[in-house]
């Protein structure tokens, strides 16, 4: 992992279920309250590394994500204070094996936490240069835009309110 400013092995990766309107529209629903799941630090990879689909699986899917990298301990902080604990933001891809998703019953351990399934980077944008309410993500597949959406970093940060430095929320 060699993205400047992004931890090689974050202590925690907290992922938000259905963080973007485009994903909610694809699924036809949005949860009333945000829910989260954890990914292993070993799932982190650098941009451009090869992702391997395990034998016996066929539904390897992407989810473009905005990764918020926590730079200072964030315990019992208000939503208004949360951005001051952010080191920066970068792009991420939350790969998943959808053939295993139903069997995992929401834990996502086998389907989304495999080695290399969370590429980060290529660069960390310092928090001072990125506003928490104006983050956008665009994902291309074979040169075609497959995702173009935005979200509030406040939603992503709320997952990290008990986090220490080198945590990542996607």
Residue ranges and their predicted role:
Residues 75-90:
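N-terminal accessory regions of nucleic-acid-interacting proteins
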Residues 42, 71-75, 95, 127-129, ...:
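Short loop segments at secondary-structure junctions
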Residues 24, 47, 77-79, 99-101:
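Short helix/loop capping segments that flank catalytic or ligand/cofactor-binding pockets
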Residues 58, 65-75:
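Phosphate-binding/catalytic loop of phosphoryl-transfer enzymes
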Residues 1-6, 23, 29, 98-170:
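Catalytic-pocket segment enriched in acidic/His residues
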Residues 65-69, 90, 138:
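Residues embedded in well-ordered beta-strands
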């Amino acid at each position: 992992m060699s993205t400047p400013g992004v931890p090689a092995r974050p202590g925690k990766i907290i992922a938000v279920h259905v963080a973007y309107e485009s994903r909610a529209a694809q699924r036809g629903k949005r949860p009333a309250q945000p829910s989260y799941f954890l990914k292993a630090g070993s799932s982190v990879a650098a941009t451009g590394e090869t992702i391997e689909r395990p034998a016996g699986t066929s539904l390897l899917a992407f989810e473009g994500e905005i990764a918020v990298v926590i730079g200072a301990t964030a315990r019992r902080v208000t939503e208004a204070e949360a951005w001051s604990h952010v080191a920066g933001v970068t792009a991420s891809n939350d790969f998943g094996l959808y053939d295993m998703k139903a069997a995992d019953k929401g834990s996502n351990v086998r389907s989304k936490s495999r080695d290399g399934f969370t590429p980060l980077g290529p660069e960390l944008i310092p928090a001072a240069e990125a506003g928490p309410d104006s983050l956008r993500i665009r994902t291309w597949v074979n040169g075609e835009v497959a995702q173009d959406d935005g979200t509030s970093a406040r939603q992503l940060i709320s997952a990290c309110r008990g986090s220490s430095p080198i945590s990542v929320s996607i």
